[in-house]
Swiss-Prot record:
It comes from the Eukaryota. It is found in: Secreted, Cell wall. The keyword Secreted applies. This is 35 kDa cell wall protein. One of its GO terms (cellular component) is extracellular region. It comes from Phaseolus vulgaris. The keyword Secreted applies. Keywords: Cell wall, Secreted.
Amino acid sequence: ELPVNFYALNLTADNINIGY
């Protein structure tokens, strides 16, 4: 999944899994 924060903040757990 690609939450909005993935682009803006990369703070949520989902973002960490995808971004990092």
